[in-house]
């Protein structure tokens, strides 16, 4: 395998981390007490030329865990009725087990070592994901315990915007505000945004790194 081909592997792009786009809709801001209501996950892949693309999607409506808190302000914001039977909600345990099975498979197939959460304002989603994994008592958590890729920060650097809708529009993506705050829609837009930023950096010559050129242009 040539050096160029090696750089075009997903495992070599993010130092063996397997990027997984996550969006979580919740019934509040406290990951230990407030219910997770909806989770969407999108895996990513790199083509033979090293361009990043969306791959597979998982999407679950979640039943509030026993004893969890439902904040009225939160559900008024995301417009989720936690107890509507038409949601087709499943248990948090089943959702998390399905997610981790998918992530572990991707890590293995892509030759990576662990998953890394990609999210918009990633601290929020990462905290809720870690709390949910802890609640369902899964010991082998494939995700990095604290490192994330935050598209709010990345888009602030790339296009000068940190709000998801504004960042998408600034980079040339459409955004439907009527679909916002759905975990599925927001994860799709976050994945599109992340891929655009990564691919734009590559297109500008930022990846793969030219070590000699980087030393000459160092500040």
From Swiss-Prot:
The keyword Zinc-finger appears for this protein: no
Taxonomic source organism: Buchnera aphidicola subsp. Schizaphis graminum (strain Sg)
Its biological purpose: Trims short 3' overhangs of a variety of RNA species, leaving a one or two nucleotide 3' overhang. Responsible for the end-turnover of tRNA: specifically removes the terminal AMP residue from uncharged tRNA (tRNA-C-C-A). Also appears to be involved in tRNA biosynthesis.
Similarity section: Belongs to the RNase T family.
Binding of Mg(2+) 1, residues: 23
NCBIfam families from the UniProt entry: RNaseT (TIGR01298)
Annotated GO CC locations: cytosol
Residues the record marks as site: Important for substrate binding and specificity: 29, 77, 124, 146
Protein's name according to its UniProt entry: Ribonuclease T
Keyword annotations of the record: Exonuclease, Hydrolase, Magnesium, Metal-binding, Nuclease, tRNA processing
Active-site positions on this chain: 181
Domain Exonuclease, residue spans: 20-194
PANTHER family (alphabetical): DNA POLYMERASE III SUBUNIT EPSILON, RIBONUCLEASE T
InterPro entries: Exonuclease_RNaseT/DNA_pol3, RNase_T, RNaseH-like_sf, RNaseH_sf
Binding locations of Mg(2+) 2: 23, 25, 181, 186
Name of one Pfam family that matches: RNase_T
Coiled coil: none
Top EC category: hydrolase
Note describing how the cofactor binds: Binds two Mg(2+) per subunit. The active form of the enzyme binds two Mg(2+) ions in its active site. The first Mg(2+) forms only one salt bridge with the protein.
Enzyme Commission code(s) on record: 3.1.13.-
Subunit structure comment from the entry: Homodimer.
BP term (GO), one: DNA replication proofreading
Encoding gene, per UniProt annotation: rnt
A GO molecular-function annotation: 3'-5' exonuclease activity
Cofactor dependency: Mg(2+)
